[in-house]
Amino acid sequence: MCCLTPVLALALVLGAPWQALHGAPLAELSGDHDFQLFLHKNLEFTRKIRGDVAALQRAVCDTFQLCTEEELQLVQPDPHLVQAPLDQCHKRGFQAEVCFTQIRAGLHAYHDSLGAVLRLLPNHTTLVETLQLDAANLSSNIQQQMEDLGLDTVTLPAEQRSPPPTFSGPFQQQVGGFFILANFQRFLETAYRALRHLARL
């Protein structure tokens, strides 16, 4: 069998359902040192970002007693909040450019939405701003890897940032901040799984 390029191997891996990935490792990709280094470095980076999001979720819980989504089932955030899709990262019609672009677009969107969390938790300004910087840096890392793999990239310039969402009242702001963090955590978990499965090849 001829060796797979990193792009083709990436497409085959992420094109399979998550359950199938454990049974069909592609050893061909393991020899690409730079690609594996990228994966391991950014797995650690993503884990660090997830930890920071969890710390802010605990702050929302401690400050506003908003701790679980079950408690807020009947409360709809106002306005509708970002829920960035990552469906292209684990479907059979996978395209590497689309998966990585979805991750980058989601990081871009959540970076902007975190402005609402910044207003909600002024005592945690440093952590929120660090989280925004880390999201931007992770997006930049992925863009660089896309370029290294010869994938098409979409430029997401900082000057085109969207303003953070605004809310109709204090309680809606608290609920909105809660769901921004919860949605971001789910997004990061999915992105983390994609990188982790690739790193296990």
Curated annotation (Swiss-Prot):
Superkingdom: Eukaryota
One Gene Ontology cellular component annotation held by this UniProt entry: extracellular space
The UniProt record lists the keyword Lipid metabolism: no
Keywords, in A-Z order: Disulfide bond, Glycoprotein, Growth factor, Secreted, Signal
InterPro entries: 4_helix_cytokine-like_core, GCSF/MGF, IL-6/GCSF/MGF, IL6/GCSF/MGF_CS
Pfam families, per the entry: GCSF (PF16647)
Subcellular location(s) per record: Secreted
GO terms, molecular function: cytokine activity; granulocyte colony-stimulating factor receptor binding; growth factor activity
Segment forming the signal sequence: 1-23
A biological process term (GO) from this entry: positive regulation of cell population proliferation
Keyword Disulfide bond among record annotations: yes
Annotated function: Hematopoietic growth factor that stimulates the proliferation and colony formation of normal and transformed avian cells of the myeloid lineage.
Family annotation (PANTHER family): GRANULOCYTE COLONY-STIMULATING FACTOR
Name of the featured protein: Myelomonocytic growth factor
Species the sequence originates in: Gallus gallus
